[in-house]
């Protein structure tokens, strides 16, 4: 399963947050991509895991612990049709 994690960073911290998220290693999930974006979020990361609980753990124990992360919103990828 995959999820997009929309990340809001502290002012002036988007670059550091993006770099920090990109360097995360977790036995629970793999970071596939990290991109800076415009709009209400600063960074969007794509994660992949074989288990929903492990994915959640990677977000709470990994991404949310990166210095400068203020808030995350997780969007699970679903198949249409």
Language model segments and positions:
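A compositional/biophysical signature of low hydrophobicity enriched in polar/charged and small residues
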Residues: 1-81
């Amino acid at each position: 399963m995959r999820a997009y994690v929309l990340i809001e960073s502290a002012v002036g911290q988007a670059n550091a947050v993006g770099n920090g998220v990109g360097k995360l290693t977790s036995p629970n999930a793999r970071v596939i991509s990290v991109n800076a974006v415009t709009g209400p979020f600063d960074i969007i990361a794509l994660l992949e895991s074989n288990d929903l609980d492990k994915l959640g753990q990677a977000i709470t124990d990994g991404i949310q612990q990166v210095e400068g992360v203020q808030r995350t919103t997780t969007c699970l990828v679903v198949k249409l049709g």
